[in-house]
Amino acid sequence: MTSSLVGSEMCIRDRGAHHKTIPLRRMPGLFYKEMCEAGVLGFIQSASVPLRALYDRPLVNDKNTTFDNLPEVCDIKLDEHQYAVIEQMAKERREFWLEFDIRNHFKLGPVKYHNVVASIKGTKYPDEYVIISGHLDAFDVATGGIDCGTGIGPMMEAARLIALSGAKPKRTILFIAFAGEEFGLLGAKAYARTHQNELGKIANLFNRDGGPTPPIGISVPQAMYDDFVEICKPVKNINPDFPFEVKVAKPRKRPTSTGGTDASVFAVEGVPTYGFTTDDIKGYNFSYGEIWHTERDLYTKNIPEYQEHTAVVTAIVALGVANLDKQLSREGMYKE
């Protein structure tokens, strides 16, 4: 195998073959079919660090993509620093070999997916709900330890803590691990669609999908403020290292389309989705941008004491909402 520099890209060719190289842009396009027919083995493109598993999203989301016209040639995004070394060698007209172990597998769908739902049934208002959620899938080449292990982990621990305490909440508490979040909020949309009659009875959905940093507060409408101040009083006594403040949130514009998290599916339906404000309070120098959808998204990037504190706060606040004598008011959530 040999490689030829093609503009700012490289084209992998059979050793000994003599094909004219064609300049490429970000994605192979110009004469792509002809190059494949001519025997090109693949393409190498420089990619900024960290490498994000987002390059195939245009292909995945293209409605014209079918099982019959999937790519047959590998398109390799290489660490820009490694690429620079190879690029310099090519400019020097040095011969070198590149070896890649490429294992891509396509399976004809549809692919089944499942939400995982657990519940602690309410004793007085079993048909009213508090939801704690995260998403089960990951969209990267790592393990999803952060996105969304930092949501699923505290959710499961909060469930364990509430169950272990023997608490009997007045409202039903649901713990939901949504499937298919990274491919269009599929699990959340399916749940909302099949539970339309329950959406008006959801007091709040606490969705965690943004890294391991711990809760330091929550902002809610004026109509919910007094309830949350009372609910959150025990939170300040958990650990003096972690402050917590309840603030008043200004009315917001009601969303008309979903966003980047499962919570947005419920927000469109008018369900309260007020989540915790978080911060790297102890200065671990965590950067979500450095791991989001990259090979760095590992459980080793997690911060145990942050996760533990998050689980306790989540359990206390969710249980507090579930035990209110009245349903949380939705007054003042949205601008008139």
List the predicted regions and their residue ranges.
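Single conserved hydrophobic/aromatic residue that forms the stacking wall/gate
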Residues: 1-7, 11-14
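Short, conserved micro-motifs enriched in small and acidic residues
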Residues: 2, 26, 142-153, 181-182, ...
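Second-shell loop/turn segments in exported
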Residues: 15-26, 30-32, 71-76, 104-107, ...
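Non-catalytic positions within long, well-ordered alpha-helices that form the structural scaffold/packing
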Residues: 32-39, 267
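Structural recognition of the beta-strand scaffold that forms the well-ordered cores
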Residues: 41-46, 75-77, 117-119, 129-133, ...
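Soluble metallo-hydrolase cores and metallopeptidase-like ectodomains found primarily
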Residues: 61-145, 157-170
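His/Asp/Glu-rich mid-to-C-terminal helical/loop segments that flank catalytic regions of hydrolases
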Residues: 68, 160, 283-336
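Metal-dependent peptidase/peptidase-like ectodomains
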Residues: 73-75, 125, 140, 178-285
